[in-house]
């Protein structure tokens, strides 16, 4: 079992390059098979979720050529509407994007119910509602979603709740439906806009992504394209809070500052100095930070994927902070681990009350999910002494070379696999 071992207590200082957005890359890779021509995608993050999805694409007949770690060519001319089995995609929730892509291209999709992080029920009912409205027949049999249609037809769909996944998935299918589809109460996240831009670069006709209403005029075929994925605003935000929690001075490069507005607002609120450039943001924390209140919301509100990172930082702030999690249930599991490090926290339903302490104590903790795992690493970096983070497979799902990037800005962190390596690390840093 791989673990991170961390010697904390020093500020993080320097510059770190942010990679492509995982949450944009996953649906874009799925959508790439909707044309029979070759698609080139670059600025891909080299993370486990991406590699699992590429293997699944290959398994249904797509030709995959890795140009380099961050660039891939995909040709979907050999794609068949074969079943996508649980073993192929059990580790990633984004497997549901195959439904929209295959329904649009092949008029049939059989996909195992998705896996991924355990952070609540995260239903896919809005996806299925959208597909049915477009004319697909949907059955759930033996842990699989079976979707079939003779022809998808454009329609007017109002989502009952704002869902990033449903917005993207239904938009993909509607891109090749007959007629015009209007989607209302849609998600506006940057990766929703990115997948719309990608589909448009292949010849789709999608307007309004990033606004309240998306209008899609279906086309009969899509064509080849070359496309670069947007930077990952969640990876950027993670390093920004790492700077804040460690009283550091970090510049995150290759970002779109507009995508980070909610994160920047909270960093300024708790006392950080934040400077924005064209494609970079600098975060400086010179003194002890102060408490605040935060509520997770759909974009452009504060992102749920940044909730654990601010939670860890607030545990070290002066005063009492309140976090309200309005997107997912079970997203406070990391606070039990943080309490093992001396944090004073109380959870009441979807609200966490955090009493700031002067310092945390090193401990052995376990990552309950992707973002929580990264947040616990931040806690370790902000804490004097040796902290060990178990179950880092979650972190590797969504962060490329996480420990290397932290080391580049002064973090003392290594990946280990045995007690012997742990002892070797302790000797080295003692």
What are the roles of these predicted feature ranges?
Residues 1-430:
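Short, structured segments at the rim of ligand-binding sites
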């Amino acid at each position: 079992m791989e673990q991170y071992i961390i010697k904390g207590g020093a500020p993080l200082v320097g510059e770190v390059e942010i990679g492509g957005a995982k949450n944009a890359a996953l649906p874009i890779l799925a959508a790439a098979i909707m044309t029979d021509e070759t698609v080139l995608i670059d600025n891909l993050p080299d993370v486990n979720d991406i590699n699992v999805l590429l293997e699944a694409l290959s398994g249904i007949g797509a030709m995959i050529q890795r140009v380099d770690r961050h660039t891939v060519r995909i040709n979907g001319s050999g794609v068949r509407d074969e079943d996508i089995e649980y073993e192929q995609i059990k580790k990633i929730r984004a497997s549901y994007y195959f439904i929209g892509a295959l329904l649009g291209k092949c008029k049939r999709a059989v996909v195992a119910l998705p896996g991924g992080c355990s952070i609540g029920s995260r239903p896919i009912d809005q996806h299925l509602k959208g597909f049915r409205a477009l004319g697909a027949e949907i059955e759930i049999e033996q842990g699989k979603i079976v979707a079939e249609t003779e022809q998808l037809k454009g329609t007017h769909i109002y989502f009952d709740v704002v869902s990033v996944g449903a917005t993207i998935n239904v938009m993909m299918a509607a891109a090749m439906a007959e007629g015009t589809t209007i989607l209302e109460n849609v998600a506006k996240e940057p990766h929703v806009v990115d997948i719309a831009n990608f589909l448009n670069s292949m010849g789709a006709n999608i307007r309004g992504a990033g606004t309240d209403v998306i209008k899609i005029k279906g086309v009969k075929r899509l064509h080849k394209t070359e496309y670069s994925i947007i930077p990952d605003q969640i990876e950027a935000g993670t390093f920004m809070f790492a700077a804040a929690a460690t009283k550091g001075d970090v510049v995150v490069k290759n970002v779109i500052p507009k995508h980070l507005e909610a994160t920047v607002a909270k960093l300024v609120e708790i006392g950080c100095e934040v400077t924005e450039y064209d494609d970079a943001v600098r975060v400086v924390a010179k003194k002890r930070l102060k408490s605040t209140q935060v509520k997770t919301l759909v974009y452009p509100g504060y992102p749920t994927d940044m909730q654990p990172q601010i939670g860890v930082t607030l545990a070290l702030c002066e005063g009492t902070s309140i976090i309200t999690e309005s997107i997912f249930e079970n997203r406070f599991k990391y606070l039990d681990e943080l309490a093992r490090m001396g944090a004073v926290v109380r959870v009441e339903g979807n609200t966490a009350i955090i009493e700031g302490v002067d310092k945390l104590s090193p401990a052995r903790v376990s990552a309950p999910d992707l973002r929580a795992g990264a947040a616990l690493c931040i806690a370790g970096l902000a804490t004097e002494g040796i902290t060990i983070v178990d179950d880092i497979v979650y972190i590797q799902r969504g962060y490329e070379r996480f420990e290397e990037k932290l080391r580049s800005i002064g973090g003392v962190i290594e990946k280990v696999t045995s007690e012997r390596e742990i002892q070797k690390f302790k000797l080295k840093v003692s």
